[in-house]
Amino acid sequence: DGTDTYTTPPFPVPDPKEFNDYILVFPAGSGIKPIYVYLKEDPRKLPGVVTGHGVPLSPGTRWLDMSISNNGNGAPIPAHIADKLRGREFKTFDEFREALWLEVSQDPELIAQFSSGNQTRIKQGLTAKAPIDGRHYGPKDIVKKFQIHHRVAIEYGGSVYDIDNLRIVTPRLHDEIHYRR
């Protein structure tokens, strides 16, 4: 019953944030064997260095035109934006996302392609909102902001910070790529 047994904690006591695996033990007599569980850290929350070259934009090309960002595989990261990010280390993918949009805000040709409301967002490092036709209307919420899609999914070995693995897509296309193809 455990009333006459003392449990001694391990020494030194491990830092709780280092625990990422467990053994689940079920009650005696339940017939269920212990299960080993490993909780993997989300790679987007891990640091990384930006790689990749992006794609040169043809003169006069609208980067996030709906025909690109709402169809196919989305819009690639422009090469001149990739050049500014390549080699930089970020603590998380969220920090990378912010830096990407801030670099876009510094490019007069790219920033001019956005509405004034989106320009304000982008200059703050926030993601631009997609046009209404590109939004995803889910059962619980409406996703309005452009998404950064990993062409080769992270779970299948796709690099988190490789610009050549990234595409900017509308929420609608992102949903289609992940759940309807």
How would you label these PLM feature ranges?
Residues D1-Q147, V152-R181:
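Nuclease and nuclease-like effector domains acting on nucleic acids or nucleotide cofactors
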